């Protein structure tokens, strides 16, 4: 594109200059300022860092723009400046346009600044950024204007000076307090206390009351980082960027005093939480509500969906920011007047950290001098790059070579100065030359009457005031994503009296800026009086006007990604390169004009330019008001259509014969503004809404039918096109189901070329539009026949509406549809909710497409699904931050034994509906004779159904061949008992043996945060069992006293805690949850053990291997001394433990037991167990030796009764012989609970001091179980190493266990 700097500057003819001005005006990086728009100011584009565009770099290179970075290293700032043609100079150089520093500036450096040079700090900014100075300033404002008016900080004390006051306050309220150093950042030196004795008084610190009721999202604490730009302190001008960051802690919030030292729970600083192992980062810049860092807009949209008033919240946040800066305004403005030679030399970007409590009241935590610009995640780059680019644009870098400031500029322009910059008015030495030039420009444009113009308002103003007024208005025109929160017509009335720096600039700016708004002073003053009378700093709802709602809509909108910005700028650039219409290529005689004509044309052109900017801003704001509710469609256009003003210009040119003034004046005539009508309580009828939606779809179809144009076929372009077409496919799939007429959808295959797919998709969309329009016509006919008058009353004028539809662009239709959907709280009017029954069963897999991207062609209209599909949809908005993309599913393992018949009823396994899965599938298994089932693994989330035992089988195979299925299974109980919905439930009495063998071969690893709770639960459970057995009760009475509901509640709590950690799943945590589930099974079977088993059943260990059989011990009468219930329970427990030991031993040594059923060599559990046992061989040997020595030292002198005898069978396993009385009835063997591997050490039960019970050692104190062959043999012979020990009681003997 031709630019003025690339041409030969020797040609100084007037025609050449005019052409150069025209070319320069079209450049995307130039915005013209000054009275006659003669001073070029550089416009920054955030997407420039993605590509090396010479068209953007050429401006900075032509003017030799430069920067230097001192005492900091900001890669983002360096990248943006370099991409716009700046070059970096040495830190000691004085020829620069920008000095970016990380510390405060010395006064002598500020005095040497020229008018074109800028620095990123004001003098004495530490009045805000040092915590002690900020506290002092806020306290001073509280004393002056009242405590409640400036109650924006928690109760704070400065130690050691105010230590006595702090102790006095602590004695009244002993809540937690937070200690912060007065001059630190990134969470360094911050800790919590609950006693004054814990504070070190060696240095100055700040102690603030800890806000113990923060607003939580998914039970996690968070704060908000806000970016505040101040361009001037005299007059005070404050901007707030529309996007920020919500930073989450990595540990769920708990008010308990035991967690007071957990910084990952109470501190939200990124520098602190990134060190946590639970920190989650998001790699997709379009996903803003996942991980430990959200965008502020995503947080606000979430709160709005939860029913919170985000408009009032952001009004309170603006109130907090303005009051904070006003508290330090006097000191900083005084320093600027003393040290800074030019008002525009300094600007400052502050980082405000705000915490929101449960009542939606924002609290100021701190103000950062140089907020972090590090981009550790794509979301950081998107937000911070856009913010920095918009900030540089607002500040306004004049395109001027910094080397020019060394020479004294002449009073009048010379040839050399005009050659270096022909578009900038020559300036004298400061300060008179700039004022003279501005005054001349202002006098020449005194006839301007449009809104926002200076017009006749310059009368009575000094030169400096005129210059300040012009600069503030131009800054606001270039604000981009920044929102000016002070001064505005509302905030000036509320906070103007708080200003302490008494100068005329603030008053002049307020009166001149807002004089065309009528007289809102009375209503605003009434609102302020009401607020003052109430004594509360909160803004009343009545005073929240339309501007506050507009600001809230801007804060809630999603920020465009850099890729979308790049494509939009490229499309606008292509439009600018098209041939100009006759309006531009005027006859040569039009260049010869008087000065008055030129000024009049310039006024009209400026009016048109400002109106176009205002219309664009209003359109953007209206588009971003879209509601993020469940059924609101997100309609975002990727490519803006060519403006229709060109066709209007052509028609006017042909009719008027070249009178440009009349042409452009006629374009100012107001047109039918449908959005404004909707905002003014107007509404569309249902037919009109469908007509508008059909017109929007037609625009999308036309865009699909267009060629790719000059677009280069790259991988990124193809991916974006594919993604956008996928969204149209998803829309057609869902929308076609709601049509009353049948429509056959033949969607293109993904194997086709992109252009072919676009053509087919456009054809299908056209067929859909035809059917859709027919249904709309039928609806209109029904309405006319029924003569429903309210439709005509609700709808707008039909003629104007049809004219609007004919002329509206895609963006305008999108804005109307978005606002209409937000206003009516539903999108069902576009497609309805009617769906034929034949289509209800259609389910489309949409998991492959991404949603909610601002650059997509269109978003699918979300229709309320049928009832039968409501449970299958994914609703993960609230939990999306902590859920991973892949879900762990349970594995169903069943074994086959052909020798043993199965006479019980078949078990049907059905899949439990899972909210994390996109659909529900039912898996029905009907095992034949000899089949039984067991779940080898369980999901991380366990339902809280009580666990019931199943009927014991006579003989069950000991090994299983794995068969994998997905999902968690529901197992109907053959005995008619309630279903057990836990994944660890087993069919068959000993099917948990396989899980036990699998668990014994693994190493347990739990997070430190979960150890305490798990240990406490297990210890409490076993101590409760021992206490019950101590009282000599039998099994049935013990089960009656045992409160199973408490175990169920604890199990549910543990399951919820583990489910919250699904983003960092661990198979070891699942194993622990399985053991707690089995524990519930074991306790629930006791009270049914005597009645559920035939008297002939008594399982013991056979000499030949792990085969369960029923057998009587001939030595039973000799050793009989136990009650029937205790004896039976004891026998079953030891038999089960022996089976586990035997199987683990056989797997570790490789000696296969002689049994008619041999496990397959490819068994998953066998290979996994052998692998894990081999890895733990050396460690387990040492742990076994230590455990054996410890227990032998403790129990060496003890003598145990000979009630049970354990004998070893050579290499084949262990045999347990139990003695029972001849008249004793055997009981059912319960489901044995297998503890975690870390608790399966060689353990000898410790005899109680009173010889009435056998205590079980705490799980956390037991060493890891050995897996080697030697460890198994030695452990079973000398240490009595069962898998888990169940206490046995007797009313006569102190113990019944014999080694």
From Swiss-Prot:
Residues binding L-glutamate: 247, 270-271, 293, 384
Site (Essential for specifying initiation versus elongation step of the polyglutamylase activity): 186
GO CC, alphabetical: ciliary basal body; cytoplasm; microtubule; nucleus
Catalytic activity: L-glutamyl-[protein] + L-glutamate + ATP = gamma-L-glutamyl-L-glutamyl-[protein] + ADP + phosphate + H(+); (L-glutamyl)(n)-gamma-L-glutamyl-L-glutamyl-[protein] + L-glutamate + ATP = (L-glutamyl)(n+1)-gamma-L-glutamyl-L-glutamyl-[protein] + ADP + phosphate + H(+)
Residue ranges of every copy of the TTL domain listed in the record: 62-407
EC number, UniProt record: 6.3.2.-
Localization in the cell: Cell projection, Cilium; Cytoplasm, Cytoskeleton, Cilium basal body; Nucleus; Cytoplasm
Annotated GO biological process: microtubule cytoskeleton organization; protein modification process
Any one Gene Ontology molecular-function term assigned to this protein's record: protein-glutamic acid ligase activity, initiating
InterPro entries given in the database record: TTL/TTLL_fam
Region (c-MTBD region): 378-488
Binding site residues for Mg(2+) 2: 366, 368
Biased composition regions of type Polar residues, renumbered to the chain: 1104-1130, 1217-1230, 1258-1275
Function: Polyglutamylase which modifies tubulin, generating polyglutamate side chains on the gamma-carboxyl group of specific glutamate residues within the C-terminal tail of tubulin. Preferentially mediates ATP-dependent initiation step of the polyglutamylation reaction over the elongation step. Preferentially modifies the alpha-tubulin tail over a beta-tail. Required for CCSAP localization to both polyglutamylated spindle and cilia microtubules.
Subunit and partners: Interacts with the transcriptional coactivators NCOA1/SRC-1 and NCOA2/TIF2.
Domain notes: The flexible c-MTBD (cationic microtubule binding domain) region mediates binding to microtubules. It is positively charged and becomes ordered when bound to microtubules: it interacts with a negatively charged patch on tubulin. The presence of positive charges in the c-MTBD region is essential for proper binding.
Protein name: Tubulin polyglutamylase TTLL5
Organism per entry: Pongo abelii (Sumatran orangutan)
């Amino acid at each position: 594109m031709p630019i003025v700097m690339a041409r030969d500057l020797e040609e100084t003819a007037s025609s050449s200059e005019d052409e150069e001005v025209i070319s320069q005006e079209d450049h995307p990086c130039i915005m013209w300022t000054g009275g006659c728009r003669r001073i070029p100011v550089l416009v920054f584009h955030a997407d420039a860092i993605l590509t090396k565009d010479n068209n953007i770099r050429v401006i900075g290179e032509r003017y030799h723009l430069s920067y230097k970075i001192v005492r900091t290293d900001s890669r983002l700032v360096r990248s943006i400046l370099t991409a716009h043609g700046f070059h970096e100079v040495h830190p000691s150089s004085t020829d620069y346009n920008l000095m970016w520093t990380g510390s405060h500036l010395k006064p002598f450096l500020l005095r040497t600044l020229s008018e074109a040079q800028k620095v990123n700090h004001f003098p004495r900014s530490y009045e805000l950024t040092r915590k002690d100075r900020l506290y002092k300033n806020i306290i001073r404002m509280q004393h002056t204007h009242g405590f409640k008016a400036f109650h924006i900080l928690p109760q704070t004390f400065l130690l050691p000076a105010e230590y006595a006051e702090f102790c006095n306050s602590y004695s009244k309220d002993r809540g937690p307090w937070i200690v912060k150093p007065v001059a630190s950042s990134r969470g360094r030196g911050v800790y919590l206390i609950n006693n004054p004795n814990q504070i070190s008084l060696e240095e100055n610190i700040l102690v603030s009351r800890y806000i113990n009721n923060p607003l939580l999202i998914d039970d996690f604490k968070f704060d908000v980082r806000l970016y505040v730009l101040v361009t001037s302190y005299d007059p005070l001008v404050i901007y707030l960027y529309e996007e920020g960051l919500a930073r989450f802690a990595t540990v769920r919030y708990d008010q308990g005093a035991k967690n007071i030292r957990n910084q990952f729970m109470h501190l939200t600083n990124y520098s602190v939480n990134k060190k946590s192992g639970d920190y989650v980062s998001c790699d997709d810049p379009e996903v803003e509500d996942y991980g430990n860092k959200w965008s502020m807009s995503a947080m606000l949209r979430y709160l709005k969906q939860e029913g919170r008033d985000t408009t009032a919240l952001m009004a309170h946040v603006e109130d907090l920011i303005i009051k904070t800066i006003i508290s330090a305004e006097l000191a900083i403005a005084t320093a600027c007047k003393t040290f800074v030679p030019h008002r525009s030399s300094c600007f400052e970007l502050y980082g405000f950290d705000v915490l929101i409590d449960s009542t939606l009241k924002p609290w100021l935590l701190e103000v950062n001098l140089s907020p972090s610009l590090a981009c550790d995640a794509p979301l950081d780059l998107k937000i911070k790059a856009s913010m920095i680019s918009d900030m540089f644009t607002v500040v306004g870098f004049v395109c001027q070579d910094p080397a020019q400031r060394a020479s004294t500029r002449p009073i009048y322009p010379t040839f050399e100065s005009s050659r270096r910059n022909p578009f900038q008015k020559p300036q004298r030495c400061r300060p008179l030359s700039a004022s003279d030039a501005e005054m001349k420009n202002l006098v020449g444009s005194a006839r301007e009457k449009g809104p926002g113009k200076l017009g006749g308002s310059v009368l009575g103003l000094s030169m400096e005031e005129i210059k300040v007024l012009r600069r503030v208005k131009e800054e606001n025109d270039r604000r981009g994503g920044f929102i000016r929160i002070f001064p505005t017509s509302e905030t000036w009335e509320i906070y103007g009296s708080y200003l302490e720096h008494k100068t005329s600039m603030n008053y002049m700016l307020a009166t001149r800026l807002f004089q065309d708004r009528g007289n809102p002073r009375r209503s605003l003053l009434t609102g302020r009086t009401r607020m003052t009378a109430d004594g509360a700093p909160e803004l009343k709802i009545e005073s929240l006007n339309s501007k506050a709602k507009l600001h809230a809509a801007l804060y809630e909108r999603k920020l465009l990604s850099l890729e979308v910005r790049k494509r939009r700028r490229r499309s606008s650039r292509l439009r600018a390169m098209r041939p100009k219409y006759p309006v531009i290529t005027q006859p040569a005689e039009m260049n010869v004009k008087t000065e008055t004509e030129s000024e009049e044309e310039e006024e009209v052109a400026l009016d048109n330019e400002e109106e176009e900017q205002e219309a664009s801003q209003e359109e953007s704001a209206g588009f971003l008001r879209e509601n993020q509710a469940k059924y609101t469609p997100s309609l975002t256009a990727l490519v803006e259509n060519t403006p229709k003003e060109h066709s209007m210009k052509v028609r006017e040119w042909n009719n008027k014969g070249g009178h440009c003034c009349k042409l452009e004046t006629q374009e100012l005539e107001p047109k039918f503004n449908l959005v404004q009508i909707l905002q003014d309580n107007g509404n569309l009828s249902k037919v009109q809404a469908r007509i508008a939606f059909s017109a929007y779809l037609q625009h999308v179809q036309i865009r699909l039918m267009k060629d790719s144009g000059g677009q280069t076929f790259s991988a990124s372009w193809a991916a974006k096109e594919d993604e956008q077409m996928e969204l149209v496919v998803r829309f057609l799939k869902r929308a076609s189901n709601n049509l009353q007429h049948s429509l056959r959808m033949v969607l293109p295959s993904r194997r086709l070329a992109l252009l072919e797919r676009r053509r087919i998709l456009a054809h299908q969309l056209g067929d859909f539009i035809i059917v859709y329009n027919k249904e709309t016509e039928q609806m209109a006919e029904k309405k006319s026949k029924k003569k429903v008058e309210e439709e005509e009353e609700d709808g707008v004028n039909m003629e104007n509406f049809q004219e609007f539809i004919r002329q509206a662009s895609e963006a305008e239709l999108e804005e109307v549809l978005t606002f209409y959907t937000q206003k009516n709280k539903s999108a069902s009017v576009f497609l309805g909710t009617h769906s034929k029954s034949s289509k209800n069963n259609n389910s489309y897999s949409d998991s492959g497409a991404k949603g909610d991207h601002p650059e997509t062609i269109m978003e699918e209209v979300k229709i309320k699904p049928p009832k039968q599909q409501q449970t299958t949809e994914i609703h993960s908005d609230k939990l999306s931050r902590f859920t991973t993309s892949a879900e762990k599913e349970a594995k169903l393992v069943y074994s086959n034994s052909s020798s043993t018949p199965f006479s019980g009823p078949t078990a049907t396994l059905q899949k439990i509906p899972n909210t994390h899965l996109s659909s529900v599938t039912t898996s029905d298994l009907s095992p034949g004779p000899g089949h039984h089932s067991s779940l080898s693994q369980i999901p991380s989330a366990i339902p809280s159904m009580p666990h019931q035992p199943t009927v014991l089988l006579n003989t069950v195979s000991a090994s299983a061949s794995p068969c994998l299925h997905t999902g968690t299974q529901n197992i109907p109980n053959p005995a008619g008992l309630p279903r057990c919905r836990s994944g660890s439930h087993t069919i068959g009495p000993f099917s948990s043996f396989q899980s036990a063998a699998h668990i014994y071969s693994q190493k347990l690893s739990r997070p430190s945060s979960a150890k305490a709770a798990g240990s406490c639960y297990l210890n409490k459970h076993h101590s409760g069992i021992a206490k019950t057995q101590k009282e000599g009760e039998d099994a049935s009475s013990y089960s009656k006293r045992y409160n199973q509901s408490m175990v169920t509640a604890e199990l549910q709590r543990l399951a919820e805690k583990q489910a919250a950690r699904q983003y960092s799943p661990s198979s070891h945590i699942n194993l622990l949850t399985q053991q707690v589930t089995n524990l519930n099974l074991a306790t629930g079977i006791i009270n049914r053990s005597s009645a559920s088993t035939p008297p002939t059943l008594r399982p013991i260990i056979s000499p030949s291997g792990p085969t369960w059989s029923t057998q009587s011990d001939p030595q039973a009468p000799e050793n009989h001394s136990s009650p029937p219930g205790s004896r039976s329970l004891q026998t079953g427990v030891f038999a089960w433990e022996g089976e586990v030991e035997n199987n683990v031993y056989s797997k570790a040594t490789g000696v296969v037991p002689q049994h008619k059923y041999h496990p397959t060599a490819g068994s998953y559990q066998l290979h996994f167990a052998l692998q894990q046992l081999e890895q733990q061989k050396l460690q387990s040997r040492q742990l076994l030796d230590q455990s054996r020595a410890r227990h032998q030292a403790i129990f060496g002198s003890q003598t145990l009764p000979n009630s049970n005898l354990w004998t070893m069978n050579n290499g084949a396993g262990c045999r347990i012989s139990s003695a029972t009385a001849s008249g004793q009835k055997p009981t059912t063997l319960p489901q044995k609970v297998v503890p975690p591997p870390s608790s399966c050490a060689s353990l000898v039960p410790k005899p109680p001091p009173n010889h009435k019970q056998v205590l079980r050692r705490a799980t956390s104190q037991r060493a890891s179980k050995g897996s080697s062959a030697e460890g198994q043999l030695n452990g079973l012979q000398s240490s009595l190493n069962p898998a888990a020990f169940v206490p046995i009681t007797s009313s006569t003997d102190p113990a019944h266990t014999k080694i």
